[in-house]
Design a protein with these regions (language model features):
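A secondary-structure boundary/capping signal
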Residues: 29-30, 102, 139
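A late-sequence structural motif
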Residues: 121-162
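Short amphipathic alpha-helical segments and helix-helix/interface helices
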Residues: 17, 43, 106-107, 152
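Hydrophobic hinge/microswitch elements
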Residues: 73-119, 123, 136
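Generic structural signal for helix capping and beta-alpha/helix-loop junctions
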Residues: 61, 108, 125-127
Length: 162
């Protein structure tokens, strides 16, 4: 494999990692869901709501917040758990519950009003690590290969200019 695009944390030094963009997860829900169930204002209010959770190999991403120097699990009741983020986003649009999803993946639905970003305090996260991003990865020695250099340079300039 010449190049890869990965969401998460910066990998180790064995590969070259170029940060393309932030991968901030935000809580969203359909306006009709919020009208029927109320809009959570504080992170702990999420515990009373239906949750749409993304599953990783280690299990569902919890919803967490930092309050008074401690991390709290504020996860809602698990209505659906899936490793298909597109399906989870569709469930949120269909008024099923609250979903923590990357901003870039739901931006079109936010712009159209299909979902609303929940402005909750303190800020809700899926991890204690605040440096989630989308990275372009390649082997350091591969950059000298013309096709890899052209692809890397194009992707970096195209994505970072948006």
């Amino acid at each position: 494999m010449d190049i890869a695009i990965r969401g998460g944390y910066a990998p180790n030094e064995r590969v070259q990692a170029v940060r393309l963009m932030d991968n901030e997860f935000i809580p969203v829900a359909a306006p009709d869901y919020l009208a029927s169930n109320g809009t959570p204002m504080h992170a702990t209010d999420l515990r009373d709501h239906q949750g749409l959770f993304f599953r990783t190999p280690n299990g569902p991403h919890p919803w967490m917040c930092e309050e008074n120097g401690q991390w709290l699990d504020v996860s809602g009741k698990a209505l659906s758990i899936s490793n298909n983020s597109t399906w989870l986003r569709r469930e949120a649009v269909a008024w099923r519950g609250i979903c923590m999803t990357p901003r870039w993946s739901v931006q079109e639905d936010l712009d159209s009003g299909k979902v609303k970003e929940l402005l909750i305090t303190p800020k809700v996260r899926i991890t204690q690590n605040k440096n989630l991003a989308i990275y372009l990865l390649y082997q350091k020695q591969q950059y000298s290969v013309p096709k890899v250099k052209v692809a890397v340079d194009f992707l970096v300039s195209h994505i970072q200019s948006q």
